[in-house]
Swiss-Prot record:
It catalyses: (4aS,6R)-4a-hydroxy-L-erythro-5,6,7,8-tetrahydrobiopterin = (6R)-L-erythro-6,7-dihydrobiopterin + H2O. SUPFAM superfamilies: PCD-like. Its EC number is 4.2.1.96. This is Putative pterin-4-alpha-carbinolamine dehydratase. GO terms for biological process: tetrahydrobiopterin biosynthetic process. The keyword Lyase applies. GO terms for molecular function: 4-alpha-hydroxytetrahydrobiopterin dehydratase activity. It holds the Pfam family Pterin_4a. Keywords: Lyase. It is an enzyme of class 4 (lyase). Belongs to the pterin-4-alpha-carbinolamine dehydratase family. InterPro entries: PCD_sf, Pterin-4-alpha-carb_dehyd, Pterin_deHydtase.
């Protein structure tokens, strides 16, 4: 378990600042398999997870969904045969917040508890 995954998400208001470039790289080092992408001018954190079949991918999607509901912070999830793409960003602030990195670390823990193809 990473230290980052042990942190609690904090309430994020619309005027909360996005993480700085330095924070992005520092926090990103704790979730090295995630990549930072920019879509429509919004920085996002994304990772693709692979599984042996659709049932495992769907089970993982539901586990991430449960995690998201518990924290009140929700990703974009694309579920395909043997693959799930998870994308975290803070909708209210239109970019990355520390919460996104916390949730990425927690998503990694969910993945580690599942049987995966890779």
């Amino acid at each position: 378990m990473s230290e980052l995954s042990e942190l609690k998400c904090e309430a994020c208001s619309a005027d909360a600042p996005t993480v700085s470039e330095a924070e992005m790289h520092s926090l990103g080092a704790d979730v090295p398999e995630w990549r930072i992408v920019e879509r429509d001018g919004i920085m996002q954190l994304e990772r693709e997870f692979t599984f042996r079949n659709f049932a495992q991918a769907l089970a993982f999607t539901n586990q991430v969904g449960d995690l998201a509901e518990a924290q009140g912070h929700h990703p974009a999830l694309i579920t395909e045969w043997g693959k799930v793409t998870v994308t975290w960003w803070s909708h209210k602030i239109g970019g990355l917040h520390k919460n996104d990195f916390i949730m990425a670390a927690r998503t990694d823990e969910v993945a580690q508890s599942n049987v995966r193809a890779d």
